From Swiss-Prot:
It holds the Pfam family MTS. Monomer. It comes from Marinomonas sp. (strain MWYL1). One of its GO terms (molecular function) is nucleic acid binding. This is Ribosomal RNA small subunit methyltransferase C. The gene is rsmC. InterPro entries: DNA_methylase_N6_adenine_CS, Mtase_sm_N, rRNA_ssu_MeTfrase_C, RsmC/RlmG, SAM-dependent_MTases_sf, Small_mtfrase_dom.
């Protein structure tokens, strides 16, 4: 994996990265490069980047995939590097998580592409750090640093859980979410449209024995709605362990923890077996950029995980060029709905001739 522009900016300044270092949500394999010169740990919330570091040989005893950092993994870091997340709430969460892990006088490094909103993050750094300032900038990226000069509050994971009641498609659900999870704290418009359309669909009458996959589960709203509607056990998949934790919390809040199987996966890599139904409001961004490769890879692989005559339901912004990709993957598709800027597509695993 080539280093992206943000990591290249860190390379320009790595003479300052010495001692014991933690990377929070690295976006490429730069932690491995730096580990040849320093004592480096990496905390990932994305299965994709976790797998990338494993593949290149990063020490697995210093590499962690989790929604929160456990103290037994390490503390007293000299430097902690955070890659600017798209969601500002997730940056707040990461800062609250890692500040207690930083030794007094230690340094936080925040690096991000200008499009990520990093320019507006200085105030967030100043809330817990001193001597905050711009260290460097290049290739439309910025690097800020700040020092820990004051005591910090212990991190309490439960303080970051958002819980609310949501009415959707004939059901009242208790939903839980965490910073950075898709649709955090609210009902996504596309999901609302999808569930209302599925509520009218013939297959929803009797599928308690069906295998159903929710791809890109977010806070678990689709998975929970499907379980309540059908009685089926749902497999919920996401690349983000924050999303998987939110889904776990959502099912627990509705007293149906045993009704879901959670899978952390880059695309469908970790999926075994076949499903009668796959339902998805798929991601179409890599960072801040539209990225068709995520959906294209998913559509091309999903046919390997559909039963004979198995069905796929997709909701998407109607400007996304999904129809030709669906046709290439499944041979054909049907558009079930188009309005309000969204479309719902239906595909089926072709019967063998």
């Amino acid at each position: 994996m080539n280093l992206n522009s943000t990591s290249q900016l860190l390379v320009r300044n790595e003479e300052g990265l010495v001692g014991k270092i933690l990377f929070a949500n690295p976006e490429d394999t730069y932690p491995l490069d730096l580990s040849r010169k320093a004592d480096v740990y990496a905390w990932c919330q994305s299965k994709t980047y976790y797998d990338a570091l494993l593949r290149v040989g990063f020490a697995d005893e210093k590499l962690f995939l989790s929604e929160q950092w456990a103290l037994e993994h390490g503390s007293d870091f000299d430097h902690i590097v955070i890659y600017q997340p798209k969601a500002k709430e997730l940056l707040d969460y990461l800062l609250a998580s890692v500040l207690p892990l930083l030794k007094e006088g230690g340094q936080i490094w925040l690096v991000g592409d200008n499009k990520s909103g990093v320019k507006s993050s200085m105030k967030r750094l100043e809330a817990g750090l001193d001597e905050v300032g711009k260290r460097d900038g290049a290739k439309h990226c910025l690097l800020y640093t700040g020092y820990k000069r004051r005591p910090t509050k212990p991190f309490v994971f439960e303080d970051w859980i958002t819980t609310w009641k949501q009415e959707v498609a004939g059901q009242t659900l208790t939903l839980c979410s965490l910073p950075g999870v898709f649709g955090h704290g609210k009902l996504d418009k596309g999901t609302d449209i999808l569930l209302n359309q599925l509520n009218q669909h013939r297959f929803m009458s009797d599928v308690a024995s069906a295998r159903i996959l929710d791809f890109g589960c977010g806070d678990g709203i689709i998975a929970l709605w499907l379980h309540n509607k059908t009685g089926a056990r749902i497999t919920a998949l996401d690349d983000s362990v924050m999303a998987l934790k939110a889904t776990e919390l959502t099912f627990a809040a509705n007293q149906v923890s045993d009704a879901v199987t959670l899978i952390a996966s880059n695309g469908l890599d970790e999926v075994k077996g076949r499903f009668n139904y796959v339902v998805t409001n798929p991601p179409f961004h890599s960072g801040v950029n539209t990225d068709y490769s995520i959906a294209e890879s998913f559509f091309m692989m999903v046919k390997q995980h559909l039963t004979l005559n198995g069905e796929l339901f997709v909701v998407a912004n109607d400007f996304l060029r999904y129809p030709p990709i669906l046709d290439a993957a499944l041979g054909s598709h049907t558009r079930l709905y188009r309005d309000r800027g969204f479309a719902i597509y239906h595909g089926r695993q072709p019967k063998k001739k």
